């Protein structure tokens, strides 16, 4: 009988040890996944912020370049209907942009050591009090930078990261 008891105790110890190993392995895998997601999210924010900072360095409007601002503000600003279309942006490089609205409808796939990131930009006028999108010219423009990556998911759906910035003509 003594031999069977030792065998059963050994088997029980092996089962307990296996459960501990499975739990530890699961915890290590979860921590690694969280670390990788954190690094990718940091890259997403960096890329989006880079676009916003670059756009902020440009003129508020194509009509505000040079020494003389438009005589009618905000009516003299570029109408939304004259912002670049998706077709316009297919042939343009970011280095050619001279005004804030030039980023409208721009999109690109940027490759980094962390993978490929899809970036798209929308620029539009916003109401001066509610900051909601409007069609007429105002002294406020908003830029939305959307960044996605095939490696970042929320469940089965890809995560969409949206960075925003509101620019005021008078704050330049």
Feature roles, as predicted:
Residues 2-49:
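Aliphatic-rich helix starts adjacent to a transmembrane/signal segment
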Residues 42-172:
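Low-complexity, Gly/Pro-rich coil/beta segments used as flexible assembly/activation regions
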